[in-house]
A protein has these predicted regions:
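Bacterial N-terminal signal peptides that target proteins for export
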Residues: 1-8
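C-terminal motif of bacterial Sec signal peptides marking the signal peptidase cleavage site
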Residues: 16-19
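Bacterial signal peptide processing site
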Residues: 21-24
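Surface-exposed, polar helix/loop patches in the mature regions of secreted/periplasmic/lumenal proteins
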Residues: 94-148
Length: 181
């Protein structure tokens, strides 16, 4: 009887330890899906983001706090609609985690966008900004902005100063994404 109790106790402890680190994370989600044919992934240095010529010193220092961007996009088509729904649900579950604080949410022309961050409340700085955008006809994109002591308010101000954000401004990036894999 003591042997069974010991085995059961050890099994429970091992199960508890195994489950502690098993919660899904964005990093793990990226790694698990970057080679899937339905996804496109990019790792971009912050140097690819440009500010307007008359950008403020504050916007320039905010951009300097950003190190890189990880982009993972699910490209939806008729053949993968079921997987699209499944993957969208997975991403939403991950970013619902309490460690992510919502910064802004908006809907426009059938697109949903959520911006969240993870960081320190003590000094109002963040180390990861997450942008999730969904378009029911095209798929979704997940962007992780990684940096050191980024400030959410300053990032929002800087976004207003980012140069040419029209269709032509992203044409090169769109062409690159089409040819990836």
């Amino acid at each position: 009887m003591k042997t069974i109790t010991k085995i059961l106790s050890i099994s429970i402890v091992m199960l508890l330890f195994a489950s502690c680190g098993s919660s899904p994370s964005l990093q793990k989600y990226y790694i698990d899906n970057q080679d899937d044919d339905n996804f496109r992934s990019l790792d971009l240095p912050a140097s690819l983001v440009s500010l307007k010529d008359d950008a403020s010193a504050e916007a320039q220092s905010t951009l300097a706090s950003i190190k890189k961007l990880n982009v993972l996009a699910f490209v939806k088509n008729e053949a993968n609609e079921a997987q699209y729904a499944l993957e969208k649900a997975k991403v939403k579950a991950i970013i619902k985690d309490k460690k992510y604080v919502e910064l802004i949410r908006f809907k426009d022309k059938g697109r949903d966008v959520v911006v969240k961050y993870e960081g320190s409340e003590e000094d109002n700085s963040i180390d990861e900004l997450v942008v999730y955008g969904n378009d029911k006809s095209q798929g979704f994109a997940l962007v992780r902005v990684l940096g050191d002591k980024m400030e959410p308010g300053k990032i929002l101000k800087m976004m207003n100063e980012i140069g040419d954000i029209d269709g032509d401004g992203f044409k090169g990036l769109k062409d690159l994404a089409k040819n990836m894999k």
